[in-house]
UniProtKB/Swiss-Prot annotation:
Binds 1 Mg(2+) ion per subunit. L-tryptophan binds at S50, P276, Y277, M278. Chorismate binds at G311, T312, Y426, R446, G460, A461, G462. Mg(2+) binds at E338, E475. GO terms for molecular function: anthranilate synthase activity; metal ion binding. Feedback inhibited by tryptophan. Keywords: Amino-acid biosynthesis, Aromatic amino acid biosynthesis, Lyase, Magnesium, Metal-binding, Tryptophan biosynthesis. This is Anthranilate synthase component 1. Part of a heterotetrameric complex that catalyzes the two-step biosynthesis of anthranilate, an intermediate in the biosynthesis of L-tryptophan. In the first step, the glutamine-binding beta subunit (TrpG) of anthranilate synthase (AS) provides the glutamine amidotransferase activity which generates ammonia as a substrate that, along with chorismate, is used in the second step, catalyzed by the large alpha subunit of AS (TrpE) to produce anthranilate. In the absence of TrpG, TrpE can synthesize anthranilate directly from chorismate and high concentrations of ammonia. Its cofactor is Mg(2+). It holds the Pfam family Anth_synt_I_N. Heterotetramer consisting of two non-identical subunits: a beta subunit (TrpG) and a large alpha subunit (TrpE). The keyword Magnesium applies.
Amino acid sequence: MFYPTLDEVKIMAKDYNIIPVTMEVYADMETPISLFKRFEESSCCFLLESVEGGEKWARYSIIGKNPFLVVESYKNKTIIRERNGSQREVEGNPVEIIKGIMGKFKGANLPNLPRFNGGAVGYFGYDLIRHYENLPNVPEDDMGLPECHFMFTDEVLVYDHLKQKIHIIVNLHVNGNIERAYISAVDRIKTIHREILDTRWKTADNSVLSYNKKKNELAVTSNISKEDFCRNVLKAKQYIRDGDIFQVVLSQRLCVETNENPFNIYRALRVINPSPYMYYLKFGGYRIIGSSPEMLVRVENGIVETCPIAGTRKRGRTKEEDEALEKELLSDEKEIAEHVMLVDLGRNDIGRVSKFGTVAVKNLMHIERYSHVMHVVTNVQGEIREDKTPFDALMSILPAGTLSGAPKVRAMEIIDELETVKRGPYGGAIGYLSFNGNLDSCITIRTIILKDGKAYVQAGAGIVADSVPEREYEECYNKAMALLKAIEEAGEIR
């Protein structure tokens, strides 16, 4: 059965210009992984998943392919590619260009569907801030990736873990004959359903994760030596003593040569380090694979929310050691001072787009546990103003204070001085912009970028007045550990 009906669509078309048409099918013999592997050969596709509390899969996994637009931006040039093969270039602020494209769509919000049922999926890079702030000391761009890259998709598969069903969603564009468009959407749903049922996929790939203790140790290189990183920490501490900043986040980029199957790396990562934001994004010649624990900003039903994370410890080997490390973390004056500072920064960022008096702190300084580390986390919420959009909320926070510092602009100037290369996607945002007005994004951390036979992993540490350089250097490696392990484990998938 297809929902909504043609008659219902005709009524909705008076108020909306893009309407999701959906059919539910049983999926008790499928997984999100088996589904996605049917469509991974598409040049641009994505898989979004989520784990709640570090241990329970969230209700929905979302698969997208066959985008009708792909938008990528380099400085002031944005390339827009259409599904029919045509493309054009537009000059100007890429955020405003994507905002303009999204502004053309007014999507219907149907009940019983997830937050995202069609729209744009991709990333905004850290360096987009240069379109809003004067940061003249631009580091070298050694990776050559777009400042932002988005797939606009009107075909989505939603795997419902609770009901063990798949929502096959095709968005109908209201731009002509409604009946013809509805029939076309229904036909497309039927085609996708046949692809799901195709028995060739049942035996095409029966690879499994097998854990062989004898693994080849990865040859990991960094773009900065330990001595130089520690020297930069001392320089940052001098800026703090001089009163320039209270805190700054310094990072290093690790690199590993690999020829492992990219999707197998994602499969290993989702087992090793399940997180609130799991993503596999395929953009033609490169892929972004991640398990970010940290929300950047979410806008849903008029509520705007951010979730600062600051304060980290390694997980203990036993329950008792784990609890002792939690107690140590929550009594660490340096970590708590840094966290409170970033919560205040989050309140200020949310306040710029929220109604007066609605900004509130929720769940102050609670602990969230992941496979290799634990973090101190706080939620900040507000009611978004009528004159503000989800884009305004996103740009009020990007880049997050937890990846830049405080005050934010001066901290970013110091990052440009001390880090030798542009951050690219790292420290920016990955997420979706839905046709129905919802936005959800995470900070691009705990992320692997695969390009030209190399895997890049970037991680940082928050520097404050009493930081110990060697400990900050080690924190970067602690944060990268799960990602490097996933690359190792991918080689064990047989």
